[in-house]
Curated annotation (Swiss-Prot):
It comes from the Eukaryota. The keyword Disulfide bond applies. GO terms for cellular component: mitochondrial intermembrane space; mitochondrion. Residues 1-10 have a biased composition (Polar residues). The gene is COA4. Residues 71-87 have a biased composition (Basic and acidic residues). It is found in: Mitochondrion. Residues 31-72 form the CHCH domain. A motif (Cx9C motif 1) lies at residues 34-44. GO terms for biological process: mitochondrial cytochrome c oxidase assembly. This is Cytochrome c oxidase assembly factor 4 homolog, mitochondrial. Residues 1-24, 68-87 are annotated as: Disordered.
Length: 87
């Protein structure tokens, strides 16, 4: 009696057209101007595997994002005021 080796499946994973696109979170961080501090957090976490040892990097990233959010709020407020002044 001969035993045949089962063939593997021939399924193929559908290729997404957006595979080449950058992750939306990475895009957001890059646009914020905080990519360098985010990278520092990632690098520290990869090295230490313990977020507690990365608190200076985490705090720097938090400060950068907070400043960016404050700038964004101010910009939105200015646009809102300009729009209401035109009406």
């Amino acid at each position: 009696m001969s035993t045949s080796v089962p063939q593997g499946h021939n399924w193929t994973r559908p290729v997404k057209k957006d595979d080449d696109e950058e992750d939306p979170l990475d895009q957001l961080i890059t646009r914020s101007g905080c990519a360098a501090s985010h990278f520092a957090v990632q690098e520290c976490m990869a090295q230490h595997q313990d977020w507690r040892q990365c608190q200076p990097q985490v705090q720097a990233f938090r400060d950068c994002m907070s400043a960016q959010q404050a700038r964004r709020r101010e910009e939105l407020q200015r646009r809102k005021e300009q729009a209401s002044a035109q009406h």
